[in-house]
Amino acid sequence: MRLPATLLAPLLVLLLLGAQLAQAADAVEWLNRANKAARQLNYTGTYVYRHGEHEEVLRVSHRLDGKQELQKIEVLDGPHREFIRINDDIYCHLADGKTVRVDKRTAQRFFPAVVPNNPARLDLYYIPKLGGIEKVAGRDCQIVILEPRDRYRYAQSIWVDRATRLPLKSQVVNERGIAVSTFMFSEIEIGKRPDRALFDVRMAGKRAQAAGERMGALDDVWQITPPPGYVRILESMRPLPGIRIPVLHSVYSDGMSNLSVFIEPILDSDDSGLEGLSTGGAMSVYARRVEGHKVTALGEVPPAALLETANSVQKK
């Protein structure tokens, strides 16, 4: 029996929609497993981080001891820096060799932990879909693509190891199809537990520096409204190079994309520096003055996200 054309078109639309929903569910399941693999597997590897015209080579070691998650990141080129994460506490050995910056109870995570704890929520702001299969570090990977649903975030792709579900590559691509940043393993060993001594925080003879005083009172003074989907994950007062007084710093995230807002008083002797929008390199930056303060928004996000966030800032 042949269906009338008036019924055939809606049926085809329903079939297409069903296929899209099924593929989105498959993509989210890959992301769920990628999130767990990055937190639960033991692995050691070397990866490259490319952002704009810059490139860094880093080594990561990850170990799970019962309920204790240990991670070490070492920068292999340029001045030596290393980060040790013990659950939610991060210890950063600075390049001067004398200082360890300590950041307690932070939400910050390092590659390959690029997938948030609730990937299903990403469907509100991205269209998840499966791409092809490519090799990374000699291993077959399933590509998971996150296409933005609006102008406030860039497209992202994650290459997930088909055997272990560990993310081996991630990439942010702007609206022109140009890679903004890329993390990619060049070599990786999965399954072997790194030695526990690798994660010892060596404080002898070094000065501890708090990464920033946590505030919790930003809403009492400032009103900031980021784009839909972005929620505040960090708020602190922290010192910054070249600035004499601590700066209010808040970070907003949708789970994949992050943007930062800095608020600092403009002193009489200051020339306020950058104002307006700058989009050169991997980071976009937007700065403006608000009631005697300089507000700066920056991140690997579209300019629209920075403008909407910074232009919303006002004193209560």
Walk through the language-model features, giving the residues of each:
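N-terminal leader/targeting segments and the immediate start of mature chains
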Residues: 2-3, 14-15, 20-69, 77-79, ...
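Short, solvent-exposed coil/turn segments at beta-strand boundaries
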Residues: 38-40, 62-71, 84-89, 139, ...
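Short, hydrophobic/aromatic-rich segments at coil-to-beta transitions
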Residues: 40-46, 67-72, 138-145, 166-169, ...
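An acidic-aromatic
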Residues: 54-113, 169-186, 190-192
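Short, surface-exposed coil-to-beta transition loops
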Residues: 55-59, 152-156, 168, 180-182, ...
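Intrinsically disordered, low-complexity linker/loop segments enriched in Gly/Pro
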Residues: 106-156
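Gly/Pro-enriched, hydrophobic low-complexity segments
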Residues: 135-205
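Short, solvent-exposed recognition patches
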Residues: 205-293, 304-305
